[in-house]
Amino acid sequence: MHQKIIAIILSLMITSALFAQESSEKTMRRLTIGTDILPLIGGLPFGFVGLLHNDGKNEINASAFYFNDDDENISALGFYPAYRFYPKGKGKGKFFEGGVGAGFINWNYGQEKVSSITFWPTVNLGYRWSWNFGLSIAPFIGGNYGIGKVEASDGTIKTFKEDDGSESEITGSLNPSIGIEIGYMF
């Protein structure tokens, strides 16, 4: 009787130890959740989620941000879907990114509340480092072009004062796209 119990316990211990062994093949982390630290430094809440597919050669990204400037009487909610290409795969190394952002802008112009939608076609070049414990850092640089206007019913277009005293519109020009994404990969 004792031999049967010992044999059962021993076989359970051996099989549980066998199934607990790690596979030599590591599964690739596919989901990334994070933020871009440059907008955060400027006080803008910003977050993104990315999903790797095709053995990490491609990534679908979706970003969102919120902006509010009481001095300028303007606020915005933005979404930026993008697609990344990693030439070497595995979701690491050099990447090329293309996307189109949409900004839903509200401007309080006197007694009028102006609402507008702007679009921002963007291209970026970057590099992603990722570690086995999940941390991911991806600096990037590129450019975007703003399409659309934030215009009141009397024809006044929302502008921002620059440091040199000049004024510029929100859209209608080529702008730099710079960032440092920090995320965790699952």
Task: For each feature predicted by the language model, list its residue ranges.
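Extracytoplasmic loops and strand-loop junctions of Gram-negative outer membrane beta-barrel proteins
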Residues: 30-32, 107-109, 160-167
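Outer-membrane beta-barrel "beta-signal"
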Residues: 172-186
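Cleavable N-terminal export/targeting peptides
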Residues: 1-28
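Gram-negative (and chloroplast) outer-membrane scaffold detector with strong preference
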Residues: 50-139, 184
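Outer-membrane beta-barrel and related beta-rich outer-membrane complex signature
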Residues: 110, 151-153
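Structural signature of outer-membrane beta-barrel domains
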Residues: 40-42, 67-69, 101-105, 144-150
